[in-house]
């Protein structure tokens, strides 16, 4: 059996994607204190997503490829395609990635704020509600203390391999198409540094998310036309499916600065059982693992025009 002239090591793909891919927004940058009415916050963040599932499938695929080279005069391409298929699926569900993220938040009042963020090719909107602590800014109050909030984020992305040389050809050969939507619910607590987070604060909490996955694989372009009649029928059948999975996580973040400008550092960890997915040739792959998401960046505040209220009528 022949393939079109293209060859990829799963581990090589993993290394390249580590510096060129995008993933759903998973870093937690908010504190337990939502923005007071009229306040604006925006910033830039650098996020790394390290997935054990992508690493595991890439190592397995590369090891099996090496064993085929050592034990056989020729490589059984149908087996290698199945392994490569598993690597792509693991990568799409939870990629190894480094991304620059831009975000914007606005205080609505009544202890609510809203936000938008863009992480590579993924977009997200969220709303947060503060249920504990003061909701004034440092221009209005000298109060210190603990804060608590809960929110919901909706994100979406259409998956596409990077448009780079032969790596872009992979998607065309496999006829790969995937889109993903996520609903994330963070519960956040924080302790202020100074009154009303004037100098920053430390935040921590837990996260739950549910992902909705749609995917399709149309493999006919993988094989040369002259040998199509030699390819087992099951390897030519298109594969499609819908799935969903839950993720459970915890996080901590710290921001330090003064009033208008802050540096922030965050670390989140997630566990997820992605479930089973149909692969080429009728096989299935079961994926699960953990993800570590460190991030760092800067944020800027613009306060509404308010004055600190006088104390005791003075």
Where are these regions (language model features)?
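Outer-membrane beta-barrel transmembrane domain signature
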Residues: 45-84, 164-293, 298-313
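Transmembrane beta-strand segments of Gram-negative outer membrane beta-barrel proteins
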Residues: 34-52, 148-154
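Bacterial N-terminal signal peptides that target proteins for export
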Residues: 1-10
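Transmembrane beta-strand segments that form the barrel wall of outer-membrane beta-barrel proteins
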Residues: 42, 106-122, 130-132, 146-153, ...
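Bacterial Sec-type N-terminal signal peptides, specifically the leucine/valine-rich hydrophobic h-region
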Residues: 16-19
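Solvent-exposed loop/turn segments connecting transmembrane beta-strands
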Residues: 92-97, 113-126, 179, 196, ...
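Short loop/turn motifs that connect adjacent beta-strands in outer-membrane beta-barrel proteins
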Residues: 33-38, 111, 132-148, 192-202, ...
